[in-house]
Amino acid sequence: FFFLGIIIISLIFLPSFFLPKSIVLIGGKLMGYWSKFCLRIFLSTKIIIKGVENIIKDDKFFIACSHQSMFETFYLQTIFNSPVFILKKELLSIPIFGWYLKKIGSISIKRNKISRDNLSFFNDISNTVMSTDRPLIIFPQGTRVLPNDKPDFKKGVFRIYQELKISCQPVAINSGHVWPKKGLKQSNKNITVSILKQIPSGLSQEEFTKTLQNSIYSELDLLD
């Protein structure tokens, strides 16, 4: 039922692909609200948001978020200003959904391949961030993980932090207990979106990575 709604929203906004990007972005926010509605109605799940006061204002920043389910890819669009996503290039080939991702300015990369496209990847990120007031969002774990998994963050996260020279907004979400990577969805549990204090620019690789990883994993331990 959830994915049927996503398809319907995509079809409704299909004509908007020929309109300004701002119109298409409304469809993304609707998908976020739709996911909240479905979780509440079918799984009796409430969405709790903590740390709204920590959201960086009047300055450029990028979001580094834990990744346990598809929930965050939809719902974070309702909290932040339509974030720019970094995603696998293959996703752009999906009919309608891939067109939507391309239209809203998502940045794609070919995983585990050295190519001319990948060599310009960080330039694309920098140019995109500097030309818009929408924050970039990345998932430093690299892929969806199970709630109790705590892999080291990918090194590319620091490279982005280093290249952009802007603050990082850490976000921890315990969505995997309700909408897991594997298995059935669980009912009567809450999902907490915890917006953590910003990490300022200018830190060393070791200091930044340690601060980011500790802040997100420590918060997830508290949420669990």
For each feature predicted by the language model, list its residue ranges.
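Membrane-interfacial terminal anchoring regions of lipid-handling membrane enzymes
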Residues: 1-21, 26-29, 53-56, 128, ...
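Catalytic core of membrane glycerolipid acyltransferases/transacylases, capturing the structured
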Residues: 9-21, 25-29, 33, 57-114
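A short, well-structured juxtamembrane/interface segment
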Residues: 37-61
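Structural element of the ATP-grasp superfamily
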Residues: 38-39, 76, 101, 160-161, ...
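Short gly/ser/thr-rich secondary-structure transition/capping motifs
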Residues: 42-50, 118-120, 174-176
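Structured helix-beta-strand junction loops
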Residues: 45, 58, 103-104, 131-132, ...
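Short acidic-hydrophobic, aromatic-tinged amphipathic segments that line or gate anion-handling sites
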Residues: 49, 107-110, 201
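Non-catalytic C-terminal accessory region of glycerolipid acyltransferases
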Residues: 119-224
